[in-house]
Amino acid sequence: MELTHFDEEGRARMVDVSAKAETTRVATARGKVEMQAETLERIRSGQIAKGDVLAVAQVAGIMAAKQTSNVIPMCHPLAITGAKLNFEIVPPGTIEIEGIVKVTGKTGVEMEALTAVSVAALTIYDMCKAIDKTMVISDIRLMEKTGGKSGHFIREDHLKSTT
C-alpha cells in the first residue's frame, strides 16, 4: 500500500484531492475513559467542581472535530456537515465515548471523528484530574467509515455491537 502523504523524494505533502468526486462521508470512532467508581458517581450526580463534565466534553469534542486540520498537519480543512458525541456510562468506572462526523466532500472524516473522541476524553480527564489522577484514556479507534473510493470499512467489534 502506498503512503500518499510523501512525495517522490520522501518529503511530506498534503494530498491533492481536487480530482476526487464529492460524496457523503461518515466516520464513527470510539474510545473510553476508565476511572475510580467514586469519580464516575460524582460525574453522574453533578458533583464535579468544574461543572457538567459530559456537557463540556461533548462541546469540546465537536469543537475539536471542526479544528482537526489545525492540529493534524496533513489533514484537509473540511466543512463538516454534522458532528455528534455520545457517552455511555458503564459502572463501576468507565465512560465510553462515540463520535460520529459527517461531511459531503472529497476526503473522509476519520481523523475528525478520532480527534473528537480524543479531545472529549481529554476534557473528561481535565475536569476530573483534581479528584482522580489514576484515570486511563484508552481504545481510541475508528469503528466505521462510509463514502469515498476506498468504500465501506467496519470494525468487526462494531458490527457485533450494532446487531
From Swiss-Prot:
GO terms for molecular function: cyclic pyranopterin monophosphate synthase activity. Its EC number is 4.6.1.17. Substrate binds at residues 74-76, 111-112. Keywords: Lyase, Molybdenum cofactor biosynthesis. GO terms for biological process: Mo-molybdopterin cofactor biosynthetic process. The active site is at 126. Pathway: Cofactor biosynthesis; molybdopterin biosynthesis. CDD domains: MoaC_PE. It catalyses: (8S)-3',8-cyclo-7,8-dihydroguanosine 5'-triphosphate = cyclic pyranopterin phosphate + diphosphate. Homohexamer; trimer of dimers. Catalyzes the conversion of (8S)-3',8-cyclo-7,8-dihydroguanosine 5'-triphosphate to cyclic pyranopterin monophosphate (cPMP). Belongs to the MoaC family. This is Cyclic pyranopterin monophosphate synthase. It comes from Desulfitobacterium hafniense (strain DSM 10664 / DCB-2). The lineage of its organism: Bacteria, Bacillati, Bacillota, Clostridia, Eubacteriales. The gene is moaC.
